[in-house]
Amino acid sequence: MLDQKLIRENPTSVEENLSLRGKVYKISHIHELTVKKKEIDIEISSLQSESKKLSKLISQVIGKSQDNNSQELNDLKKKGNEYRIKISELEEKQRILNKKVDDEIYNLPNFPSKDAPIGKDESENLQIKTWGDPLIKENIKSHWEIGESLNIFDSIKSTKISKSRFITLIGNGARLERALINFMLDMHTKNGYLELMPPALVNSESLTGSGQLPKFSNESFKCSNDDLWLSPTAEVPLTALHRNELIDPKHLPLKYVAYSPCFRREAGSYGRDTKGLIRLHQFNKVELYWFCDPSKSLEAHKEITTDAESILKKLNLPYRLVDICTGDLGFSSSRTFDLEVWLPSSKCYREISSCSNCLDFQARRSSIRSKIDKKNTYIHTLNGSGLAIGRTMAAILENGQQTDGSVKIPDALVPYFGSNLLKTA
């Protein structure tokens, strides 16, 4: 979340920074709420101070006088009771006002980085580089055509089981998925990440801390009888892991990697990517996550992106690196680098990883701090897919397809898959 002090003291600057996202943000009403909140905070603090002084005075009067029912003492006690009533009334106003302020500020996105390219939407994202040679030739099959011919996944039966946009992996398809998960986890743990396996169900406070709630409640699946949601990404439980904690600075950076199933409604994608593995309600992903010193998050952002890139390079999958423009940034991100893998059937690159620096945005929402330079400071959080499993499988199927209908397995994956070819069982 954004700093309330900044909203209170410089609302114009806040509006200008948010406008870089290509949308007009008017926060005058939030500014008024934060000013009123500060006034009440000061008034409560002043009354509490006066109440403490009065308590000391009452103790002194009692100590000096043998008459515990004197007029002076009764007047002081009456005044003390008035203080308590007034403080209680103000604290109730404070509680209501705090909720109003939080409800408003929780809906404001992060400030875009001054280094992010200015733009209105994905058409103005900036390509930084490409890697590998994209496969371009005639008669290229799509990954879902390959999957069906090799009988490695089935969407029709999955629709019968659940609904559309679900997939059942079969035989070598399930085996390939498992191989990819193990390969990615091994790569990242060798690179200094601690492997975690968090819960797939998360509460509302966790989703609020990472930025999914309250704005994106319609994009996630909620359990009707509990305050629990199916996690849309491991970013959510990994952020919540240290909620309300003061992390010892000597432990920073904390680098986590987690495989998890992810669940999304894909509410705004009707009619898009209806076939195959690209856009599903349930998919698997390996997530990278950092907690770091604020002074080191820019370098950490480069490193987490390089770590995600290393998987694509090991699998010999052509990709490009894209700097996301201000108008296309995710809600919690200040700057994002996307990795997009080449899918020859559609003759284009498709997102396979987003590596984001959220600065202190999630740490403020989750109250995660560290004592840095003798001051309790909100730390910075970073996240990135390392990688999305289904999209990686789609890229392997399309880029590795052979004329006989089989698929060449990348060399780095052979020890995990157990064969250098994927073919009909």
From Swiss-Prot:
One GO molecular function term? ATP binding
What CDD domains does the database record attribute to this sequence? SerRS_core
* Biological process (GO), any one: selenocysteine biosynthetic process
- What does the record give as the organism's lineage? Bacteria, Bacillati, Cyanobacteriota, Cyanophyceae, Synechococcales
Quaternary context: Homodimer. The tRNA molecule binds across the dimer.
Residues given in the record as ATP binding sites: 264-266, 351-354
Domain text:
Consists of two distinct domains, a catalytic core and a N-terminal extension that is involved in tRNA binding.
Q: Which reaction does it catalyse?
A: tRNA(Ser) + L-serine + ATP = L-seryl-tRNA(Ser) + AMP + diphosphate + H(+); tRNA(Sec) + L-serine + ATP = L-seryl-tRNA(Sec) + AMP + diphosphate + H(+)
- What name is this protein filed under? Serine--tRNA ligase
Entry keywords, A to Z: Aminoacyl-tRNA synthetase, ATP-binding, Cytoplasm, Ligase, Nucleotide-binding, Protein biosynthesis
Q: Where in the cell is it found?
A: Cytoplasm
Q: Which GO terms describe its cellular component?
A: cytoplasm
Q: What family classification does the UniProt entry report for this protein? A: Belongs to the class-II aminoacyl-tRNA synthetase family. Type-1 seryl-tRNA synthetase subfamily.
Q: Where does L-serine bind?
A: 233-235, 287, 385
Q: Recorded E.C. number(s)? A: 6.1.1.11
Hey, which pathway is this one from?
Aminoacyl-tRNA biosynthesis; selenocysteinyl-tRNA(Sec) biosynthesis; L-seryl-tRNA(Sec) from L-serine and tRNA(Sec): step 1/1
Which HAMAP family would you find in this protein's record? Ser_tRNA_synth_type1 (MF_00176)
Functional description taken from the UniProt entry: Catalyzes the attachment of serine to tRNA(Ser). Is also able to aminoacylate tRNA(Sec) with serine, to form the misacylated tRNA L-seryl-tRNA(Sec), which will be further converted into selenocysteinyl-tRNA(Sec).
